[in-house]
Amino acid sequence: MSGLSLKECVPCRGGVPPLTGEEIAKLLPELDGWEVVNEHHLKKSYRFSNFREAQVFVNRVGDLAEEQGHHPDICFGWGNAEISIWTHKIDGLTESDFILAAKIDKL
């Protein structure tokens, strides 16, 4: 679906500006079902048949996050998981957030 999933997340050292609304609008169509909240973070909810499926998914996301060196906020429970992604060092969105979201969708 997206070339974003083929890229690698780049570590943010801070001091860079977050993406603008225009830049976000160009990247968002490359993602499937993600929403942008207040031009600050990406968010997506997932549904599963039971707790175990949600847990397995969350563990896979955690492994991916470690590989990429870019870590989302994850909340999950019986049959659901919610992922929020932003670059904490700049308290906003970077291309790496979109890359991670695209990679999560390929799991």
Question: Which residues make up each language-model segment?
Answer:
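Long, contiguous binding/interaction regions
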Residues: 1-32, 37-107
